[in-house]
Amino acid sequence: MGSWFGDQGRSLLVGAVTAVVTAVTFYGVVRWQPRTWWLWGWATFTALTALLVFIYPVVITPLFNKFTPLGDDGLRTRVEQLAETAGVDIADVLVADASRRTTTENAYVAGLGSTKRLVLYDTLLRSGSEDETILVVAHELGHRMEGHIWKNLALSSVGLLAGFGALAFLARQSGVWDWAGASGIADLRAIPVLLLFALLAGLVVLPIENTISRNFEARADDIAIELSDSPNTAVRVFRRLGYANLADLKPPAPLVWALFTHPPIPDRIEAVLSRSSGAP
């Protein structure tokens, strides 16, 4: 219970710091450049997004998990060989103590440049065979091979530009700020209007983001099978992950479209079987 409260407290702290930095930066830009604030805001928040990706694995994630280097055993050797084959430079291979709060099995590659590292959940190492772990690692390396992190940063930049442009248009409309009692976007009393705008924009963008994410995940699945040359292992992994992660095996199509960041487990298995059978 103490661990849960600790996690919640740290989450609140991170959220509060993020909110303060966002607000101070936004209003600083608006008051610094009252005519072209939207353009400067786009550039500033694009840079902050890239900075967050860089520092996330060394500043944020250690607040919630303990990380230990993967032992110098056969698995580490295979992981390093696979990364070399994939042409992906990894600064380190770490194990996260995810089991203290979840049964979810996962792995990910985080960071940029010197902060780039591969992280394996201890739940994954305990539940799966070595071949299954390698399949999951191959999937994560597939994301880096395809440059998905850079594509996501580029898409985020486009989304920020569209958002700031729309906000600049609204800011010029009479009456937009009246209900909040604000004189304009630079007025702190405009915050409720800005929060409402952010909420509505997020709802509009979410299905688009998730559709792109599902396409990226499907491509990473393809690369994982190419690297591991083991479609049967992929099927076993997807079945086990579906069970461990409590996945919905028959989600309604509208729900998948709006909320799913990954293809449903049955779709991923079907894609593997279709690929292995040579079907178009």
PLM features: what roles do these ranges have?
Residues M1-I185, L199, L203-P280:
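Polar-ligand-bearing catalytic/cofactor-coordination segments
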